[in-house]
Structure formats: structure tokens, C-alpha cells
Amino acid sequence: MSISIYNCFSWIGYHYVHYFLEKGIEVNGIDKIDSEKKENLHMLVGRNSSFRLIPPNSIPKDLVALVIGGTELPIYADRIIQIRTREMKKKLSNAIVINAPILFGEWMEMTEEDIKVGNRNVRFHSREFQSDAIYIKDFVKATAPLFHSSNKPSELSVFSKKVFLNEAVKLENSIYIRDNIPIEENVRKVLAHYRRYKDLYEYDRN
């Protein structure tokens, strides 16, 4: 099996690439390498024989295509899964849309105190972050089964388990992720990575 990942070197896309490669799945990556960070992320996965960086004019047909945000490029896949980020402008035709909560993780736009969420800055210690945020690796692991599932809802929403503690109020077509590791521990891990590779992180306060 192989999967096409559009915007594969966005910080979210990179984590999906890494996850599927670790599972032995071939990944066709589609992205423009136009920053030092993207060059670095390409180096991290480019030596893996199961990864191919695909030119826009040579996009293959795959069973599944994952699109982070949006794309103007053609998509040749039986199933399209689109991660709705804050920058997503429109839904792709025939795509299964996954509405993401606040996500945090390695390589995202951040500082020591906050993360970039769309056009906003969300502080690690804010009530919003503590109640809603999900670590990217937990998000990827929870959504990955959708790539193989025969169930095809048009839209899914992902929530932190902290949002709904009452089993009776769970919404249809929703995924609830429990923090198996305290959020503070994952924040410490991400901050340690940020401090180590700070020069490769990007952040724009405007």
C-alpha cells in the first residue's frame, strides 16, 4: 500500500509521513521545499527507501490521498482525507474532512510561551490550551485507522477527552482522544525539541 500526502513538509504533514513510514507504508510526498525547515524535514525522511518526493507534474494514483489544509494540485486517489487546519480555505470535492482541534508538537510555529494557531497565539498555560489541545502524535495515531476504514463519513471532528467527560454526550462522527501521558509532559518534550532546534523553527507574531 502507498499513500500520497500533500503538503507533506508542513509540520502536521511531516508527522503523518513519519508515522506511515514507521508502519512500513510507502509515502508519496507532495510539497514545495521553499524553506530551511522543509529542507531539514526532507533530509530526515528522504533517505528512507519508502519515501518519494513527487514533482507536481508526476503525481501518481493512490488508494488514499491525505491533504493537510488545501491544495490546487490534481489529486488521483480513490479516497481523499483532508485535515481542516485554520488556514484551510475550502473543502475538496469528495473529501472526508477531519476537523482538527488545537494541535501542538515538534516543528510547529511556537515560542517558549505559546503556539501559533491560525492567526492567534495560544499560551501553553491558558485554559483553552489545557482543555482543548492534543499532542500531534496522539492525533495522528487516532486518525490513521480512517485511511483503511470502509466507513466513509463526509466529516469527522476530533476532540480532547477532557472536553466531554460524560459518555452520554458524545457526538456522532467524532473521535475523542484521552491523554495517556499528561499534557504537561508532552509540552516539556516539545519545548526540549524546540530549544535544541530553535533556529529551524518558524514563528510570525503578525
Per-segment meaning from a language model:
Residues I134-N206:
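C-terminal substrate-binding subdomain of Rossmann-fold SDR/epimerase-dehydratase oxidoreductases
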Residues M1-P60:
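N-terminal Rossmann/SDR dinucleotide-binding element
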Residues W11-I12, Y16, I33-E36, T71-P74, ...:
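Short acidic, S/G/P-rich loop/turn micro-motifs used as interaction or catalytic elements
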Residues K91-V140, A144:
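NAD(P)-dependent short-chain dehydrogenase/reductase
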Residues K38-R47, D114, N166-N173:
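Short, aromatic/basic amphipathic alpha-helical patches
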Residues I12, D34-L41, L73-Y76, E87-K91, ...:
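Short, charged/polar "capping" segments at the starts of alpha-helices
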Residues N7, D31, R84, F159-S160:
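Short beta-strand/turn micro-motifs composed of small residues
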Residues E26, I59-P101:
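Conserved Rossmann-fold NAD(P)-dependent oxidoreductase catalytic core, especially the SDR/UDP-sugar
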